Structures are given as C-alpha cells and as structure tokens.
Amino acid sequence: MTKRKHVAVLLGGWSSEREVSLRSGNACADALERRGFEVTRIDVARDIATVLDQLRPDSALMMLHGHPGEDGSIQGVLETLAIPYSHSGVLASALAMQKDLAKTVMKTAGVPVAEGLTLSRDEIARGHVMEPPYVIKPVADGSSVGVYIITEQHQHPPQELFRDDWAYGDKLLVEKYVAGKELTCAVVKGEPTDVIEIVPMVRFYDYEAKYSPGASKHVLPASLLPFVYQEVRRLTLAAHVALGCRGVSRADFRFDDRIEGTGGLVCLEVNTQPGMTETSLVPELAAYAGITFDELVQWMVEDASLDR
C-alpha cells in the first residue's frame, strides 16, 4: 500500500495578515485532505523550527502572509531542515517583501513602477514630501494594511502614522498616486494567467474590500485593448523572473488609460504568497483557466522543492 504524502500547511503566524492566512491555510488544508494527503495544520509560532524538526513532514505548503512566512525567514528554517516547500525561496521572498528594493529590481528589468521615496516617519511628519495625491504605505506589509492615500484636502499626513501603537515599522514608502484601473495577473505553472480588473465598491481596494464578499467586483477578463492586456501578462512574468520567484506569484498593477499606449501601466507590487481564500484572486484566475481549487493546491504541493 502506498504511503500517503504528509504535508504540513503553515498558516496563521503573528503578522497583521494573520486572519487572512488562517483562512487561506485552512481552505488549502481542506483541499489536500479531499485529494488524499495526510495534512498537519501548523499555526506558526516562534517555536516553528522545533515543531517542524519533530514533525518531519514530506513537504510544507506555505500559506503565511507577511512576516515571518513571506519574508524568507521560514523558508530559511525549512531549507536548514531539508523540508521541501512551496512558493518562492529565501532571497526572492525577502526581496519582494521589501517593496523599495523590489521596485529597484523590477525597474532595472524594464517593469514600470510608481515614482516614490523611502522615508522615515519623522521625515514624513514634517509635512508633504511630494505634491498630492500620493500614497503612504509600509515598506514590508501586504493586504493594504497601513496604507493611506493623501489628497489635496489633507493639510498634513494622517496622525495614525505617528501614534505609539503604529505596528508597521518606521520605514515607509511614499509613492505618487496612480489613477486608473486596478489590475492583477498571476504566474501559475510558469505562465502568466489572464488579467482581472478589480472594481472596489469603495474608493480604495483596502483590506476589507479584498477579503469581504461583495466588497469588490472582479471583471475577468479585464476590459482592455488587446495589446495592453498582453503587456500586463508580459510584465507579470517579467517581474516574477526578475525577483527570482517560484511557484505561484501575483502582480498588481494600475493602468491610467488616459495616457497613450501602455505608458499609463505601472506595477505596484508582486506578492510571493498570494491569498487563497474564497474571495482571493489567484483561485479565480486559475478557475478561469480550467484549474480547480483542489488541483491548484495539489500542484503547489507537487511543485515543492528545496531548489527555490
């Protein structure tokens, strides 16, 4: 009798994206159980190295969002223990998590990025650092947590940035606000997917809009001119390769169609462990390509390796 493959699904953790990670991880664990895998769900804590060393699974499915699972830290633990894992490796994870460094790499590779600065909270507190509208966001967090859009109506940056309980680090990315359509595209099995346009029911595609059913409308395929559509796909793969990503990644874009050609297309960021909840974009893109949720999750596990 063939032994069932034992997969550890790493979920939870202690980042600001914990709740999303729990939802993603549990959905994937359920899928693997339906496919006949032996599954252990691990809510990651600071003793994760000891837990994994004792458990010794055949592989690990990474369903952590934010620190420490998306920044290369847990990947380093898994490599030390010689446990194959999914998604991107140590370097690509660390690089993509640091938005300022990732932008530099992508720009060098010919992927257009938003004009911006990396500043401390103290520097931002002195007043407007660029002409509004602009965006202030943490250098190393996802799911749009800690993100503020500063418009002409703001006399000064939001005071929440300077409170003692601010949890998103002292270093912040300040970027010129890019108007236009919100687009996303993923890389699955080494190829770019189709493109989704996200239409938030609120002004900004924030945490609530991303993870609350009905808070945003997804247009798939996105309503774009064919050459723009293909350019989004090309840039998605280019960003994935430039950062050294593996497995699944997702790139987010803005497109200002008032600018001629593809000049209004800007890559905002690349997510190395995109969400896998019921409202997440990657499962929707995969389904459009004929890949069921369970098939997608199984492929992620089968793709796991120590060569990331």
Curated annotation (Swiss-Prot):
UniProt binding sites for ATP: 130-184
Cofactors that this protein relies on: Mg(2+); Mn(2+)
EC supergroup of this enzyme: ligase
GO biological process, one term: peptidoglycan biosynthetic process
KW Cell wall biogenesis/degradation (keyword) present: yes
EC numbers: 6.3.2.4
Binding site for Mg(2+) 2: E269, N271
Ranges of residues in domain ATP-grasp: 103-302
Reaction equations catalysed: 2 D-alanine + ATP = D-alanyl-D-alanine + ADP + phosphate + H(+)
Keywords: ATP-binding, Cell shape, Cell wall biogenesis/degradation, Cytoplasm, Ligase, Magnesium, Manganese, Metal-binding, Nucleotide-binding, Peptidoglycan synthesis
Entry keyword annotation includes Lipid metabolism: no
Any matching Pfam family: Dala_Dala_lig_C
Annotated residues for binding of Mg(2+) 1: D252, E269
Family matches, as InterPro entries: ATP-grasp, ATP_grasp_subdomain_1, D-Ala_lig_Van_CS, D_ala_D_ala, Dala_Dala_lig_C, PreATP-grasp_dom_sf
Top-level taxon of origin: Bacteria
Pathway where this protein functions: Cell wall biogenesis; peptidoglycan biosynthesis
Subcellular location(s) per record: Cytoplasm
GO cellular component terms, A-Z: cytoplasm
Cofactor note: Binds 2 magnesium or manganese ions per subunit.
Gene Ontology MF: a single term: D-alanine-D-alanine ligase activity
Family the entry assigns: Belongs to the D-alanine--D-alanine ligase family.
HAMAP family: Dala_Dala_lig
Physiological role: Cell wall formation.
PANTHER family listed in its UniProt record: D-ALANINE--D-ALANINE LIGASE, D-ALANINE--D-ALANINE LIGASE B
NCBIfam families: D_ala_D_alaTIGR (TIGR01205), PRK01372.1 (NF002378)
Name this polypeptide is given: D-alanine--D-alanine ligase
Species of provenance: Rhodopseudomonas palustris (strain BisA53)
